[in-house]
Swiss-Prot record:
NCBIfam families: panK_bact. It catalyses: (R)-pantothenate + ATP = (R)-4'-phosphopantothenate + ADP + H(+). Gene3D superfamilies: P-loop containing nucleotide triphosphate hydrolases. Its EC number is 2.7.1.33. Keywords: ATP-binding, Coenzyme A biosynthesis, Cytoplasm, Kinase, Nucleotide-binding, Transferase. The gene is coaA. Disulfide bonds: none annotated. Coiled coil: none annotated. This is Pantothenate kinase. GO terms for molecular function: ATP binding; pantothenate kinase activity. HAMAP family: Pantothen_kinase_1. It comes from Thermobifida fusca (strain YX).
Length: 314
C-alpha cells in the first residue's frame, strides 16, 4: 500500500506523528529500568523511559515482525536449494550524524531486542572500529578528514559484515577508543555469530563506488536518526563541554588539554571550529544524502524527543 503526499503523488512511505507511532506499541512490555537506561545513555543524552516506551518499544515490535519474516524467507530459500539449516544474522544498520544520539539508539535496540521471549543473541558493532589508525591518517594527510568516507577501512568493514552475514562463527575486529581518539593497538572485539547484528555509524548507508557492493546491501533493516542541523550543532557543543568536565579530565584522553589548559570559552571555540570545518561538512555532504536509503527515519525535535517517524513500506 502506498500513501499520497500533500501534492497528491503516491509514495512508498508512511509518516506517523509521535502519538500514532506510540500506539503501535500494542502490548509490548517495558522491562527496562531507569538504572539500566542510565548505563545505555550517551553523554548529555536525555533519553527517558517515556521515550523508550513511546518510540523504541514500537520499533522493537516492528523489528520482531521483520526478523520473523526474514527467517521464514531464508528458510524457504534454503529448502529450495536443499541446504542445511544454518541461520544467518538479521543485520540492522543505524545511521545519523555525530551527536544525534545514534549510539544510544543502537544500545537501546541491543538491550530491547535481547529481551524478546526467545532471547536472541544480539551483537553491536560501531564502524568507528574500522577507522584507520591516526598514524595512517597522518601519513595520508587526512587527519582533518577523520569521520569522512576515506578515513575508514571500507574493505575490512565490508568483509566483516559479509562474512557475518554468510554465517561465520566468530570474527575479531579492531577496537576504537574515544578516550584515546584512536584504534587501540593489539586490542580486538570478538564477535560471535549473533542472531541479530547491529552495525552503527555515520557511514553505514553511504553508497558504494560504481560496480562495488555497499555496506547497506547486507542490511535487513536500516534506521536513520535525524534532526535539524542547528539542533545537532547545539547537542554537539553541549556534549563536548560535558566531556570536558568528565572524560577529558583523564590524563589518557586525547583532548586532556581541553580540560586542563583551555578556558571554557577556548573550548567552545575549538568545538565550534571542529563542528563547522569537519562534522557539519561531513553531515551535509555525506550523511544527510543517505537518509532516503533508510527503512525507517526517526525525526527528533530540539529537546531530543522523537516527533515523528517515517517508515518505508516497500
Amino acid at each position: 500500500m502506498s500513501h499520497a503526499t500533500k501534492n497528491g503523488f503516491l509514495t512508498p512511505y508512511v509518516e506517523l506523528d509521535r502519538q500514532a507511532w506510540a500506539e503501535l506499541r500494542a502490548a509490548t512490555p517495558l522491562s527496562l529500568t531507569e538504572a539500566e537506561l542510565e548505563k545505555l545513555r550517551g553523554t548529555a543524552d536525555p533519553t527517558s523511559l517515556d521515550e523508550v516506551r513511546d518510540i523504541y518499544l514500537p520499533l522493537s515490535r516492528l523489528l520482531n515482525l521483520y526478523v520473523k519474516a526474514t527467517r521464514q524467507r531464508h528458510a524457504a530459500v534454503r529448502d529450495f536449494l536443499g541446504e542445511s539449516d544454518r541461520p544467518t544474522p538479521f543485520v540492522i544498520g543505524v545511521a545519523g550524524s555525530v551527536a544525534v544520539g545514534k549510539s544510544t539508539t543502537a544500545r537501546l535496540l541491543r538491550t530491547l531486542l535481547s529481551q524478546w521471549p526467545d532471547h536472541p543473541h544480539v551483537e553491536l558493532v560501531s564502524t568507528d572500529n574500522f577507522l584507520y589508525p591516526n598514524a595512517v591518517l597522518e601519513e595520508r594527510g587526512i587527519m582533518n578528514r577523520k569521520g569522512f568516507p576515506e578515513s575508514y577501512d571500507r574493505r575490512a568493514l565490508l568483509r566483516f559484515v559479509s562474512e557475518m552475514k554468510a554465517g561465520a562463527d566468530k570474527m575479531e575486529i579492531p577496537v576504537y577508543s574515544h578516550l584515546a581518539y584512536d584504534i587501540l593497538p593489539g586490542e580486538t572485539q570478538i564477535v560471535h555469530r549473533p542472531d541479530i547484528l547491529i552495525v552503527e555509524g555515520i557511514n553505514v548507508l553511504q553508497p558504494p563506488p560504481p560496480g562495488r557492493l555497499a555496506l547497506a546491501d547486507f542490511f535487513d533493516f536500516s534506521l536513520y536518526v535525524d534532526a535539524r542541523v542547528e539542533h545537532i550543532r547545539s547537542w554537539y557543543l553541549n556534549r563536548f563541554l560535558e566531556l570536558r568536565r568528565t572524560a577529558f579530565e583523564d590524563p589518557r584522553s586525547y583532548f586532556h588539554a581541553m580540560a586542563t589548559s583551555a578556558s571554557e570559552e577556548e573550548a567552545k571555540e575549538f568545538a565550534m571550529h571542529t563542528w563547522h570545518t569537519i562534522n557539519e561538512v561531513n553531515l551535509v555532504e555525506n550523511i544527510i544524502p543517505t537518509r532516503p536509503r533508510a527503512t525507517l527515519v526517526l525525526f527528533k525535535g530540539e529537546d531530543h524527543r522523537v516527533r515523528r517517524v517515517r517508515l518505508r513500506k516497500t
